[in-house]
Curated annotation (Swiss-Prot):
The gene is kdpA. It is a multi-pass membrane protein. GO terms for molecular function: P-type potassium transmembrane transporter activity; potassium ion binding. This is Potassium-transporting ATPase potassium-binding subunit. It comes from Nocardia farcinica (strain IFM 10152). Pfam families: KdpA.
Length: 561
């Protein structure tokens, strides 16, 4: 089978399955978040937590619940890592060091899953299952809850800023959406050979005749939610390149589908909840258009040959698993950087300068194609607010979005939400590259302007882009075990997650308190090809104005050498 045919079949299968589940899953999630009835298990949890499921929260109360729940998650996960050596199923592993425990706790609670450790030799099965896997569920549910709160802000009229009940949204998202889907995906992965074991491992004989110890872990259960919740942290160091995590081309396609499933279907949920499904299709069209362009650029870059080894092989095969090839590796890379997943089935650091630059740009666009679970939707809706404001300036009208006026407060909150990530990326990169100890952490270095120095700069830029966007993937040539990287990247993950959430919830509260303004002849239509073009242009323009200079110093300069 030719690479072109393989690529076409994989893309077609992913698109076909997403098209089949788009309507039923999107409408189901809308019913989950608008239903007035509770499941028996949910009612029991509400009584246990002393939560009134019928009580509404203002955006301040909702934000306080998000922050309080997440802070508790960081503390519990940190303590669990520190004391894992004295807990059951430790398999002889000691407690995790304070710096790594902090970085990991922040990473998993913020849905980033940045891993500055080797999972097999650092985390016990108990820590993996009771700590990291739990956060994979609830951190995804938090993102979905915030997206739904913003939708309610657009729908509700004069509700005093009430945007729902965080505890209800969190519980329903976990029990009714994430758990059932993860269970089904885990069964499919098990059928493909993904392992599920609490044994410490086994010893065999390698090709050279020497004993080789192979680690085992409860992989299938965590692999499912790792992809479904756009988390990305692997149970094994090689992540989805490891045959125990991703053994076959079919399991690879299943994981790609799991990554894209909820972010894509949430656009249908958005359209259903606001009562105008064309709005959801417009948002989906923008996401799909950006995704297709990045996929095309990356595929073209990786299908060529650059350097002696690539020329001999006929393509950029370094760092890629032969069972996936170029098509499966590129499709996975674009999916994982277009969302907040960060899982990898190939080495992004080994990609061509243009291919690596494309997946980096995918993150720098704000991860909105189609974005993380929940975060992708509220991210692109914030950009839609900016686009409507720009459109209003062009025609001299007061901007309105779905019947809500966009006043100074709303535009300010939207702008702040958009600016958080670029500020973290640029400030973090600038400080890091001037520190003397950074040179020792670089896998690629050299005199200024040389290929090694340029790629080393790209490694640093990629790290802070990944952390600030809560992605978690990395250019593996950068060693991030120092206290500076552990703390600075941890802070980027925290601020990159929760500052935009605060601004989005404040925007939701402000919109919910407004009356609805009837549409007039001067109202900018926000459904259809015209607005899709305006929104796409806004996304590209914001990213280009912000990041083109720094990209010119890294991937672009490297590609031109």
């Amino acid at each position: 089978m030719s690479p072109a045919l393989a690529a076409g079949l994989q893309i077609a299968s992913v698109v076909a399955v997403l098209a089949l589940v788009y309507v039923p899953l999107g409408d189901y999630m809308a019913r989950v978040y608008t239903s007035s009835s509770d499941l028996r298990a949910e009612s029991w949890l509400y009584r246990l937590a002393r939560v009134d499921p019928r009580a509404e929260q203002t955006w301040c109360g909702y934000a306080g619940s998000v922050l309080g729940f997440s802070l508790a998650g960081v503390l519990v996960l940190y303590v669990l890592q520190r004391i894992q050596g004295v807990l059951p199923l430790s398999h002889g592993l000691a407690g995790v060091s304070p710096a790594v425990a902090f970085n990991t706790a922040v990473s998993f609670v913020t849905n980033t899953n940045w891993q500055s450790y080797v999972p097999e030799t650092t985390m016990s099965p108990l820590t993996q299952s009771a700590g990291l896997a739990v956060q994979n569920f609830v951190s995804a549910a938090v993102g979905m809850a915030v997206a739904v709160a913003l939708i309610r802000g657009l729908v509700r009229v004069g509700r005093g800023g009430e945007v729902g009940n965080f505890w209800v949204d969190l519980t329903r998202g976990t029990l009714r959406i994430l758990l059932p889907l993860a269970f089904v995906i885990a069964l499919i992965l098990l059928s493909q050979g993904v392992i599920q074991s609490y044994r410490s491992g086994f010893t065999g004989v390698g090709l050279d005749g020497r004993p080789v110890t192979t680690a085992l872990a409860p992989v299938a259960s965590q692999e499912a939610i790792k992809e479904l919740g756009t988390n990305g942290g692997g149970v094994l160091a090689a992540n989805s390149a490891h045959p125990f995590e991703n053994p076959t081309p079919l399991s690879n396609v299943v994981q790609i589908l799991a990554i894209l499933l909820i972010p894509v279907a949430l656009t249908r949920t958005f359209g259903t909840m606001i009562g105008n499904r064309r709005q959801g299709l417009t948002v989906l069209a923008v996401m799909a258009g950006i995704y297709a362009v990045i996929l095309g650029v990356t595929t073209a870059a990786e299908s060529g040959a650059r350097g002696a080894a690539a020329t001999a092989a006929g393509a950029m095969l370094e760092g890629k698993e032969v069972r996936f090839g170029i098509p499966g590796s590129v499709l996975f890379a674009v999916s994982t950087t277009g969302t907040s997943t960060g899982a990898v089935n190939s080495a992004h650091d080994s990609m061509s300068p243009l291919g690596g630059g494309a997946v980096l740009v995918n993150m720098l666009l704000g991860e909105i194609a189609p974005g993380g679970v929940g975060s992708g939707l509220y991210g692109i809706l914030v950009l839609a607010v900016i686009a409507v404001f720009v459109g209003g300036l062009l025609v001299g009208r007061t901007p309105e979005f779905l019947g809500k006026k966009l006043r100074r407060r709303e535009i300010t909150l939207a702008a702040l939400a958009v600016l958080v990530m670029p500020a973290l990326v640029l400030i973090g990169t600038a400080i890091t590259v001037v520190l003397p100890e950074t040179a020792a952490a670089l896998g690629n270095s050299g005199d200024p302007g040389t290929p090694g120095a340029v790629h080393g700069f790209s490694e640093v830029l990629y790290a802070y882009a990944s952390a600030s966007n809560n992605n978690g993937s990395a250019f593996g040539g950068l060693t991030v075990t120092s206290d500076w990287f552990q703390s600075s990247l941890g802070l980027c993950m925290l601020f990159g997650r929760f500052l935009p959430i605060l601004f989005v919830l404040a925007l939701a509260g402000s919109l919910a308190a407004q009356p609805r303004t009837p549409a007039t002849a001067g109202t900018l239509p926000t459904a259809g090809a015209g607005f899709a073009g305006l929104l796409t242009g806004t996304v590209v323009l914001v990213a280009a104005l912000t990041f083109f200079p720094v990209l010119a110093l890294g991937p672009i300069a490297e590609a031109l050498q």
